[in-house]
């Protein structure tokens, strides 16, 4: 399992915790507003909005909240916020790289809060470009293994995924334990998602992410704990949408941290 997969597994676990705190809801609503603003409020003609809505529904965001976010972003309802996307770069313990994606209406606030969270938790801010060059934009689709077909339980296999998506541009399928993660070129993410739907396979999320091209091994539990504390501190900021890292943490170390 690649370092990205291990981090992806952890992010899925963290998302479940964030959802309970309401943290994830706010991030999902922001994604919907931005997608509607950039491509229009009709999900049928705006695949980015379609996927943002589907992801929110999977996390049980109420339909009325989703509808309001679409209207605000599409200019059909007042109260919309003019967000901008900003990327910050940092290093953590043992040289681990962090790429921080923000959606904010206040650039100065976002910069100050990210810098404070990084420096107070054992990290250092990096020069622009020094970290981003270690990542590449990829299409990432997540599929839960346990599904239903014809009202009966159906466990999705890697072969099912490959058969459905290989011709659509899937490049790599990673086993995350309870789900599969499919990587493709960023431009192929909609094609991969559509191919899954055509095969009757449900998906959890489909989006473009930054994937590490060079992993940094983190085999010591105490160092891994510091890395996670740093990531948590940054990811919990209101302006932060995503934190990407190239930390490659072995399963046994991950389990000890989870415990």
UniProtKB/Swiss-Prot annotation:
GO molecular-function terms, A-Z: DNA binding
Coiled-coil segments: none
SUPFAM superfamilies documented for this protein: YebC-like
Transferase keyword on record: no
Gene3D superfamilies membership: 1.10.10.200, 3.30.70.980
Cell compartments where the protein resides: Cytoplasm
GO cellular component: cytosol
Keywords linked to the UniProt accession: Cytoplasm, DNA-binding, Transcription, Transcription regulation
Pfam families, per database record: TACO1_YebC_N, Transcrip_reg
Gene Ontology BP terms: regulation of DNA-templated transcription
Domain of life assignment: Bacteria
Similarity section: Belongs to the TACO1 family.
Name of the featured protein: Probable transcriptional regulatory protein Noca_2383
Organism listed in the record: Nocardioides sp. (strain ATCC BAA-499 / JS614)
């Amino acid at each position: 399992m690649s370092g990205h997969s291990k981090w992806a597994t952890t992010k899925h676990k963290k998302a479940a915790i964030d959802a309970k705190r309401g943290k994830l809801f706010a991030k999902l609503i922001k994604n919907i507003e931005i997608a509607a603003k950039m491509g229009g409020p009709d999900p049928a003609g705006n695949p980015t909005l379609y996927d943002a809505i589907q992801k929110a529904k999977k996390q049980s965001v109420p339909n009325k909240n989703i509808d309001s976010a679409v209207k605000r972003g599409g200019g059909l309802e007042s109260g919309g916020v003019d967000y901008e996307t900003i990327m910050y770069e940092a290093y953590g313990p043992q040289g681990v790289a962090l790429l921080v994606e923000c959606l904010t209406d206040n650039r100065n606030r976002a910069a100050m809060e990210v810098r404070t969270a990084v420096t107070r938790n054992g990290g250092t801010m990096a020069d622009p470009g020094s970290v981003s060059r270690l990542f590449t934009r990829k299409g990432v689709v997540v599929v839960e293994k346990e599904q239903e077909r014809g009202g009966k339980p159906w466990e999705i296999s890697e072969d099912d995924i490959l058969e459905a998506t290989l011709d659509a541009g899937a490049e790599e399928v990673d086993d995350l334990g309870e789900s599969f993660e499919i990587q493709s070129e960023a431009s192929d993410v909609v094609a991969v998602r559509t191919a899954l739907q055509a095969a009757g396979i449900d998906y959890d999320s489909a989006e473009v992410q930054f994937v590490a091209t060079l992993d940094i091994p983190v085999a010591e539990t105490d160092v891994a704990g510091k890395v996670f504390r740093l990531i948590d501190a940054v990811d919990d900021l209101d302006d932060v949408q995503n934190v990407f890292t190239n930390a490659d943490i072995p399963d046994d170390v991950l389990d000890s941290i989870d415990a």
